[in-house]
């Protein structure tokens, strides 16, 4: 992990600041409509929030004619072209994904990609010397990831952060523009995290500076992939906490500076696939059905749908997210999009304390955007 992140993010993020571009912990995905229109999204999620699954998404049966193209699942280098359009490339040649949980239901493209010419690390092994991991649909492990005889009663056979490494060209949804030197034009930047409550399924930032605040305040419930501890909410700005090569306050200032350089910047959104009900069940089906949310994001980028304006941002109006054919009732959708003012007042207080920890280096514009939301919620 260290080797690939050191230059592609840690060193590159600082180089990007000095040269006027961005090196980000983001997937790049192309969404093609049945009419052949393609929108490219760059999305940043902390560890274990479904980046690889989203990058390799397969449209559900209800979305015949839609196509999803993978350009990258982890890192995006982005620059403004001569017209002020933000464009992205993926500097990596391969995919490096968490393997437990990968199967035909969760990520069919990944299963096809890792069926040959793949390096597996810290997985269990079957009697035939095949790799095995939790939620794999075939085989039985005989040796665990530490090389010991496997006993599933004592814990996972594969390490929770065991990985696959494979050429991106093994992926059936690999985009023919993945290696285009000029990059692809980004329509939307999407942040997200794993939150049981609080964050709605999707909302849009009101402007670029508000979007930078949304990215700066990304938080997720920790998973084994990140820390070995589970369920603790931790701030992970732009999903770059482990990877930013310089002070975050200066990094946010660099993001804010793009507004002075272009009037064509992408719109910024936040998603949360992981909201749960009172019985701790996921409210949203996720996986391929996330395309329905991405379609709303694209509709907003094209100005095709109106939204409700709340203190935290623009939320979908009733009927603008297509849930036809899903087991998602109007009441469930209402829960998914609910914004609890009291919870958000607490959240903004926590975000404020986090931002203040950066002292005088914190950009005034970010402080002002935060204060606007605090006032609107009060």
Predicted regions and their residues:
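Short acidic-glycine loop/turn motifs at beta-strand connectors
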Residues: 32-36, 79-85
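Charged, amphipathic alpha-helical linker segments immediately N-terminal to NTP-binding catalytic cores
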Residues: 1-25
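Glycine-rich phosphate-binding P-loop
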Residues: 38-62
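Hydrophobic/aromatic beta-strand patches that form the interior of the parallel beta-sheet core
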Residues: 41, 69-71, 87-89, 187-190, ...
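A short alpha/beta connector and helix-capping loop motif
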Residues: 83-95
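Short beta-strand-centered segment that lines the nucleotide-binding/catalytic pocket of NTP-utilizing
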Residues: 64-80
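Pre-Walker A adenine-sensing motif
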Residues: 25-33
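Conserved NTP phosphate-binding and transfer environment spanning the P-loop NTPase/kinase superfamily
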Residues: 98-378
């Amino acid at each position: 992990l260290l080797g690939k992140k050191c230059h592609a993010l840690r060193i590159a993020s600082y180089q990007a600041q000095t040269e006027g571009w961005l090196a980000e912990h983001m997937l790049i995905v192309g969404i093609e409509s049945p009419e052949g229109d393609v929108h490219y999204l760059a999305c940043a999620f902390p560890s274990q929030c479904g980046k690889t699954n989203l990058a390799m998404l397969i449209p559900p049966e209800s979305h015949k004619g839609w196509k999803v193209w993978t350009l990258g699942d982890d890192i995006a280098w982005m620059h403004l072209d001569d017209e002020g359009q933000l464009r992205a490339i993926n500097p990596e040649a391969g995919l490096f994904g968490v393997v437990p949980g990968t199967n035909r239901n969760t990520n069919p493209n990944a299963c096809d990609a890792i069926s040959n010419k793949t390096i597996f690390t810290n997985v269990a092994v079957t009697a035939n010397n095949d790799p095995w991991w939790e939620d794999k649909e075939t085989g039985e492990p005989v040796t665990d990831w530490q090389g010991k005889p496997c006993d599933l009663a004592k814990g996972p056979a594969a390490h929770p952060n065991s990985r696959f490494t494979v050429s991106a060209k093994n992926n059936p949804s690999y985009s023919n523009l993945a290696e285009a030197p000029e990059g692809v034009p980004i329509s939307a930047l999407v942040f997200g995290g794993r939150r049981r409550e609080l964050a709605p399924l999707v909302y849009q930032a009101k402007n670029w500076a508000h979007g930078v605040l949304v990215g700066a305040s990304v938080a997720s419930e920790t998973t084994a992939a990140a820390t070995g501890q589970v369920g603790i909410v931790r701030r992970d700005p732009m999903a770059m906490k482990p990877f930013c090569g310089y002070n975050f306050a200066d990094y946010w200032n660099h993001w804010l500076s793009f507004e002075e350089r272009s009037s064509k910047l992408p719109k910024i959104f936040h998603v949360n696939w992981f909201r749960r009900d009172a019985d701790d069940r996921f409210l949203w089906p996720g996986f391929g059905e996330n395309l329905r949310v991405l379609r709303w994001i694209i509709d907003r980028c094209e100005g095709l749908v109106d939204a409700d304006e709340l203190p935290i941002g623009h939320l979908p109006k009733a009927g603008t997210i297509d849930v036809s054919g899903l087991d998602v009732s109007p009441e469930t959708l209402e829960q998914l999009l609910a914004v609890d003012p009291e919870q958000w007042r607490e959240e903004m207080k926590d975000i404020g304390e986090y931002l203040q920890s950066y002292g005088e280096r914190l950009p005034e514009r970010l402080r002002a955007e935060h204060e606007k939301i605090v006032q609107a919620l009060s």
